């Protein structure tokens, strides 16, 4: 019997497939699926519980209710398999056919499919070139549409209301034909001749001038071509036959008490059948038109509700007032088929329990409660018991296990040996959220977890729960052990740093051990070796912190693995000598001869991993942990109230601040400062007071003065518990200590603005009621934020995963010759990220030369590891061009060389590594640590914005970047270009600092001259924008008429008069057309030219410009001619944290973005309109000029006659990524996004490797716009996949034809996910209805290339260990295809050919 079932099972299995195609079903196809027509709305007979005949659950159509038994009971048992009972008509077979057999309903009148009607853009509307409203009016019987105009003046597709229809009937009789309802639409669709229409539209496309019309025609053409190539017929968008879902997929379950629980679909089907039957009856009776029409409309509405309830009109509700769940609702959303059942499934062999600490475990172990283990490993135990002969049958074994006999535990021990289990903690934000451990059986009911893996899980022991999963098959166990074992996941995939670093108690213990104390017991002793130190400590002769001399022996391991020993005497402490006992051979003693804070320990582990490899590191990490716990216990460090020492200066500092605030208040009342200034100043005062208090407090806490052996006072770090905890990095921070022992400081309101009365008390003194109330404000906001943040962060991660999920490493080297230029990140006077951190683990794209020679230092395709980075630093290399995934040339995936090092393993990345998902997780996982708020600039920040000079921090020489300058009369340089930057270079040629300097800056030093640290080298006026003269001569006023276009003003304080140009709005009508300007002339009155051009030196003056020279005054080079007052730019809120990251990845346009120059050329202004000015850029080569209207309130950085380069900033503002891509290219946009995202994460102290962000950017740049079509199939202005276009172009070039040209396009991650090649992946992400509608109309085929699609269809994913399976399958398929191709020539459409070719190329790529 068993074998027979097995055989039957094998029969029904489908063979392997390579793609999934979706299309429209024709009425015949629907009938061919069906096993019979459902004619009655009845479901089950409520007395007998048997399905009604020809009803929705009919056994004759859908199959038997019980296995191998017909409905009337005439045939039972297996022997009658396949017989159709002559009495009840039911086939005798398994009951599971009721899950797969479909029925159908023949509709009495055709019905439009709501998806193709209402899902925007309406496909039926596009096809017929009618508006959605018109079609709806036809479908819902409000007006007629002409189908056959005959010999009349009517046109086909014309709408007629009831009255006009009757008039036309009177006029023309039956010359013409007009109908209403879906029949009419069906006729219109049927009459379309696709091939003719396509031909005609392709011909008229080039001659269309209007942009909107062209877009519309292109859209329609695309739709028609999709129909044409896919073999779908337009009339199939109208249903004549409705398929009925198999009954077991919409079950009806009898509850006790004679009621039934039912799926909503049954209700919806019943309505359709009722209305359909009523309509049939009315048609048979030849009822009046109006009644039939009404019934047809109701039928249309009920089918709409069945397919997608609530898309049109109000949703149909059930008895309990909630809308019924239609077919569309079954598949979309979090609870729909895709996300609930296909992407996430429940698993068996799992258990969950609370976790507790397992401080005695090794890193690869976890403690598993016996009870859980027994339950989880039951099948293994049964098998073992039977094999041992302890139980005769499975049943007996089961009894033994239930009784928990003694032998069972022995067997369990054996089964568990070396059988890893997987532990998972929700939320699993990155791949370290599931790791494998070897179980150790323990008493009790809580899982024990090794403390060092807590950081990876983000777990703590305040009641967290974890799930245990058992890998069953041998392969699964192998993968768990080789890939997921906690000992194999030491480095974080996000940044390549160790993720197994001690924290909290362990750090405190190690820090305490390694501290030194003056006058410790045993100070000054000398020891022969480390073991002697141990004896001294154990016997109590020397204490842990005593300074001693020790002779140590170090092992040095050379690159070739040769070991040499060296001995030296070293000044150290007893504790550090003890630490060196656990130090693995080959590491230097200096690594522990320091105060071991968290950073130092992390560095120690990192060094260990890089020098000695995995095994030593794992053992060492465990030893560190045991030692740390031991000494943390011995130290007895705890928090007591006396540890919070309040500095004496606090009270005077607070009093001073209060006095200052009073003074400001008085100034405000006498009207000297504005309310805003007062507020900002008050906040500044308190912020600085707070700083001073906390500084005083930290100085007080951190050191104490001790008299040493020689009787000299010496400073030593304090052993205050709170200070030690913060200093070591175990817990707490200076900011928190400040609140305990300093003052709490300023608090924020929930809207982010700062309350100007600070809390001057600290927690030790205690808060009064008012202070407490202010505190609660912020605290409550924090809690609310956290809840929102989690949801937002999760959604960001989901979008990232979705956009990047199909990126896998598929070849070694794509051979591309360029990449991204990497420089150290310098902001102002600080190197934020040195070059080595940016290029570590990347591959060089172009040879790196030794500076000043043409000798190659690092050849192309070198993987830069730590040693190489040191070499680069020694030669003070300042920039390296490295390979990047953004420029990788592989078609469907990336190559290993462009990606570089696998961060979690430390070697070049393997084939099949799913870098897309890793990148998404690495960026999404820290999302919960980012803030949600936008920062309001208040107080300290608003002052810094108006800086007016550059003061350097390091000595070096001065370099200017893209700067034009002139020398003024004092020999100083004046900058006359926009985005200029000034850099300080040290003697090795490395850049140390970089500053932006605005137009009109006066430099105190010449280029390449030496500057000293702290020198001020550049000055400018932040409040006005000067116009600098580039030639010497005399000033000539043009159109400057006193009282018309300008006024004279005299400064009260200095008595100097100056000329102010009137704004256009303030002039009289006479002055409206005049354009005031300054012309520069020589002594003879001839125009001077701007150097290097034929342009006369004439400077047009905008409104409000202040001219300080008089007419005919002499002027020198570099002097300011006029000044334009700058309104201090409105303090913009900086969007910070998570929203900023989301905005960047969604490539959203900022409000009021910077305006960039579209082409290079000379600026001039055309005719102004009411609110805008016209900016014209004329290129030097005389080609087409470009003009743009700019609102007047925008502050322009340019004036007439100035030259700009393409992509330069014309008006300040946040830059839009799209503009950067268009005007400055891919490299710049990549740099921009990477740096901006990194800024947000850096602020929170989160390290993420640039690679991950680049991976996402690559996916955002997946699509391109076709600019010219060449000989390809693409349409101009069409959006296409870049890899597709590249493949098509390669073919064409091989055939000697013209390829298409394209512009890369930047899509936000949501848009990019929805635009993927795979409709299955897109549908399971968002907007399921729209995606599926579009795919069905185009008859799309999903090549199942990404990870998500393969999970959904239930295959191994084409990454990791599943990569090999897919590779071999594809190779076999290619063989079959090539052998088949020799025998028969099949007709293939262009798109299919292209797809096959793409697949083959893809294979070729993955083979080599």
UniProtKB/Swiss-Prot annotation:
Cofactor note: Binds 1 Mg(2+) ion per subunit.
Enzyme class: transferase
Gene Ontology CC terms, in alphabetical order: DNA-directed RNA polymerase complex
Protein family according to the UniProt entry: Belongs to the RNA polymerase beta' chain family.
Function: DNA-dependent RNA polymerase catalyzes the transcription of DNA into RNA using the four ribonucleoside triphosphates as substrates.
Domain of life: Bacteria
Name of protein: DNA-directed RNA polymerase subunit beta'
GO MF annotations in UniProt: DNA binding; DNA-directed RNA polymerase activity; magnesium ion binding; zinc ion binding
EC number: 2.7.7.6
Naturally occurring in which organism (per UniProt): Shewanella frigidimarina (strain NCIMB 400)
Gene expressing this chain: rpoC
Keyword field: DNA-directed RNA polymerase, Magnesium, Metal-binding, Nucleotidyltransferase, Transcription, Transferase, Zinc
PANTHER family from the UniProt entry: DNA-DIRECTED RNA POLYMERASE, DNA-DIRECTED RNA POLYMERASE SUBUNIT BETA
Disulfide bond residue pairs: none
Cofactor requirement: Mg(2+); Zn(2+)
């Amino acid at each position: 019997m068993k074998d027979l079932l097995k055989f039957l099972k094998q029969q029904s299995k489908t063979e392997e497939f390579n793609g999934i195609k979706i299309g429209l079903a024709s009425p015949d196809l629907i009938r061919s699926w069906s096993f019979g027509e459902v004619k009655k709305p009845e479901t089950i007979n409520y007395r007998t519980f048997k399905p009604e005949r020809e009803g929705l659950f009919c056994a004759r159509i859908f199959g038997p209710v019980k296995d191998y038994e017909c409905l009337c009971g005439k045939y039972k048992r297996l022997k009658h398999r396949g017989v159709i009972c002559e009495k009840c008509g039911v086939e005798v077979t398994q009951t599971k056919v009721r899950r797969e057999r479909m029925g159908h309903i023949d509709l009495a009148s055709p019905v439009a499919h709501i998806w193709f009607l209402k899902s925007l853009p309406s496909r039926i509307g596009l096809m017929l070139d009618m508006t959605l409203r018109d079609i709806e009016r036809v479908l819902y019987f409000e007006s007629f549409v002409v189908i056959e105009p005959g010999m009349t003046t009517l046109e086909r597709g014309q709408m007629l209301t009831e009255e006009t229809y009757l008039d036309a009937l009177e006029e023309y009789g039956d010359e013409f034909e007009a109908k209403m309802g879906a029949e009419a639409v069906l006729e219109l669709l049927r009459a379309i001749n696709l091939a003719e229409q396509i031909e005609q539209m392709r011909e008229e496309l080039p001659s269309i001038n209007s942009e909107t019309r062209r877009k519309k025609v292109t859209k329609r053409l695309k739709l028609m071509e999709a129909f044409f190539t896919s073999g779908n017929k337009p009339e199939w968008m109208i249903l004549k036959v409705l398929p009925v879902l198999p009954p077991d997929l919409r079950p009806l379950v009898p509850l006790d008490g004679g009621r039934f629980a039912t799926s909503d679909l049954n209700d919806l089907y019943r309505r359709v059948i009722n209305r359909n039957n009523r309509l049939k009856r009315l048609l048979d009776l030849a009822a009046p038109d109006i009644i039939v029409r009404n019934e047809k409309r109701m039928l249309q509405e009920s089918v709409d509700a069945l397919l997608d309830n609530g898309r049109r009109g109000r949703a149909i509700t059930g008895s309990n007032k909630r809308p019924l769940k239609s077919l569309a609702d079954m598949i979309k959303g979090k609870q729909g088929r895709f996300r609930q059942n296909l992407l996430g499934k429940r698993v068996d062999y799992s258990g969950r329990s609370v976790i507790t600490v397992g401080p005695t475990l090794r890193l690869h172990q976890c403690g598993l409660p016996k009870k859980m283990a027994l339950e989880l490993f039951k099948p293994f135990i049964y098998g073992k018991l039977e094999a041992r002969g302890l139980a005769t049958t499975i049943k007996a074994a089961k009894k033994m296990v239930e009784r928990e006999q003694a032998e069972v535990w022995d067997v369990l021990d054996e089964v568990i040996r070396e059988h890893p289990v997987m532990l998972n903690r929700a939320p699993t934000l990155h791949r370290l959220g599931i790791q494998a451990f070897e179980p150790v059986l323990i008493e009790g009911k809580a899982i024990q977890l090794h403390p060092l893996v807590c950081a990876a899980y983000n777990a703590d022991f305040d009641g967290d729960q974890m799930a245990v999963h058992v890998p069953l098959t041998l392969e699964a166990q192998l993968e768990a052990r080789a890939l997921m074992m906690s000992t194999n996941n030491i480095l974080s995939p996000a940044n390549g740093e160790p993720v197994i670093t001690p924290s909290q108690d362990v750090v405190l213990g190690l820090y305490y051990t390694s501290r030194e104390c003056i006058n410790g017991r045993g100070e000054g002793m000398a020891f022969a070796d480390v073991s002697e130190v141990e004896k001294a400590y154990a016997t109590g002769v020397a204490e842990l912190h005593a300074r001693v001399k020790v002779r140590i022996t170090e092992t040095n391991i050379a690159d070739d693995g040769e070991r040499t020993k060296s001995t030296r005497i070293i000044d150290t402490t007893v504790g550090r000598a003890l630490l060196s006992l656990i130090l693995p051979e080959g590491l230097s003693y200096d690594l522990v001869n320091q105060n071991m804070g968290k950073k130092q320990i992390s560095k120690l582990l990192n060094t260990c991993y890089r020098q000695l490899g995995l095994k030593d590191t794992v053992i060492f990490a465990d030893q560190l942990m045991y030692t740390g716990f031991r000494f943390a216990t011995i130290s007895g460090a705890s928090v007591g109230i006396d540890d919070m020492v309040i500095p004496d200066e606090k009270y005077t500092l607070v009093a001073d601040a209060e006095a200052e605030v009073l003074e400001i208040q008085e100034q405000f009342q006498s009207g000297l400062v504005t309310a805003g200034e007062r507020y900002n100043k008050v906040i500044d005062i308190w912020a600085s007071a707070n700083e001073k208090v906390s500084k005083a407090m930290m100085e007080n806490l951190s050191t104490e003065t001790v008299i040493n052996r020689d009787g000299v006072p010496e400073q030593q770090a304090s052993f205050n518990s709170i200070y030690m905890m913060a200093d070591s990095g175990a817990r707490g921070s200076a900011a928190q200590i400040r609140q305990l022992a300093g003052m709490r400081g300023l608090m924020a309101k929930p809207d982010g603005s700062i309350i100007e009365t600070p809390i001057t008390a600290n927690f030790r003194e205690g808060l009064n009621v008012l202070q407490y109330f202010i505190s609660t404000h912020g605290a409550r906001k924090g809690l609310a934020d956290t809840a929102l943040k989690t949801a937002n962060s999760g959604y960001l991660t989901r979008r990232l995963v979705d956009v990047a999920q199909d990126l896998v490493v598929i070849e070694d080297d794509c051979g591309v010759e360029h990449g991204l230029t990497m420089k150290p990140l310098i902001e102002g006077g600080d190197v934020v990220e040195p070059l080595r951190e940016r290029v570590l683990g990347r591959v060089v794209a172009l040879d790196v030369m030794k500076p000043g020679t043409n000798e190659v230092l690092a050849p192309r395709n070198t993987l830069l590891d730590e040693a190489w980075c040191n070499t680069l630093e020694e030669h003070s290399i300042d920039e390296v061009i490295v390979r990047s995934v953004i420029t990788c040339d592989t078609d469907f995936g990336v190559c290993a060389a462009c990606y570089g090092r696998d961060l979690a393993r430390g070697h070049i990345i393997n084939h099949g590594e799913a870098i897309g998902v890793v990148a998404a997780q690495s960026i999404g996982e820290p999302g919960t640590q980012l803030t949600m708020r936008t920062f309001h600039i208040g107080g300290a920040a608003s002052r810094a914005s108006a800086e007016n000079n550059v003061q350097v921090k390091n000595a070096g020489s001065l370099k200017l970047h893209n700067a034009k300058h002139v020398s003024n009369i004092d020999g100083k340089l004046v900058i006359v270009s926009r985005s200029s930057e000034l850099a300080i270079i040290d003697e090795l040629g490395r850049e140390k600092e970089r500053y932006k300097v605005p137009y009109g800056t006066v430099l105190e030093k010449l280029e390449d001259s030496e500057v000293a640290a702290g020198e001020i080298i550049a000055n400018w006026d932040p409040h006005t924008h000067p116009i600098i003269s580039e030639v010497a001569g005399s000033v000539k006023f043009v159109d400057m008429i006193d009282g018309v276009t300008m006024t004279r003003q005299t400064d009260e304080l200095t008595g100097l008069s100056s000329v102010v140009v009137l704004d256009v709005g303030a002039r009289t009508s006479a002055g409206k057309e005049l354009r005031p300007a300054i012309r520069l002339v020589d002594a003879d009155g001839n125009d001077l030219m701007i150097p290097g051009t034929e342009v006369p030196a004439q400077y047009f003056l905008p409104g409000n410009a202040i001219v300080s020279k008089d007419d005919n005054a002499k002027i020198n080079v570099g002097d300011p001619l006029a000044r334009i007052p700058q309104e201090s730019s409105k303090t913009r809120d900086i969007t910070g944290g998570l929203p900023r990251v989301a905005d960047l990845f969604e490539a959203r346009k900022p409000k009021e973005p910077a305006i960039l120059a579209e082409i290079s050329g000379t600026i001039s202004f055309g005719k102004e309109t009411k609110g805008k000015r016209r900016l014209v850029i004329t290129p030097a080569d005389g080609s087409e000029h470009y003009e743009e209207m700019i609102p007047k309130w925008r502050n322009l950085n340019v004036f007439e006659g100035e030259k700009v380069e393409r992509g330069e900033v014309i008006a300040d503002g946040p830059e839009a990524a799209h503009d950067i891509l268009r005007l400055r290219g891919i490299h710049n946009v990549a740099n921009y996004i990477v740096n901006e995202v990194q800024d947000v994460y850096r602020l929170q102290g989160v390290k993420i490797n640039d690679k991950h962000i680049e991976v996402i950017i690559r996916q955002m740049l997946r699509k391109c716009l076709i600019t010219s079509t060449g000989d390809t199939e693409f349409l101009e202005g069409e959006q296409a996949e870049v890899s597709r276009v590249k493949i098509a172009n390669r073919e064409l070039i091989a055939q000697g034809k013209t390829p298409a040209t394209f512009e890369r396009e930047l899509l936000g991650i949501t848009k990019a996910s929805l635009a993927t090649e795979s409709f299955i992946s897109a549908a399971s992400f968002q907007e399921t209805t729209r995606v599926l509608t579009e795919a069905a109309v185009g008859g799309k085929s999903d090549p199942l290339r990404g990870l998500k699609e393969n999970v959904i269809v239930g295959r191994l994913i084409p990454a990791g260990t599943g990569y090999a399976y897919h590779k071999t399958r594809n190779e076999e398929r290619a063989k079959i295809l090539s052998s088949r191709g020799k025998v028969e020539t099949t007709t293939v459409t262009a798109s299919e050919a292209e797809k096959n070719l793409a697949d083959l190329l893809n294979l070729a790529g993955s083979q080599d």
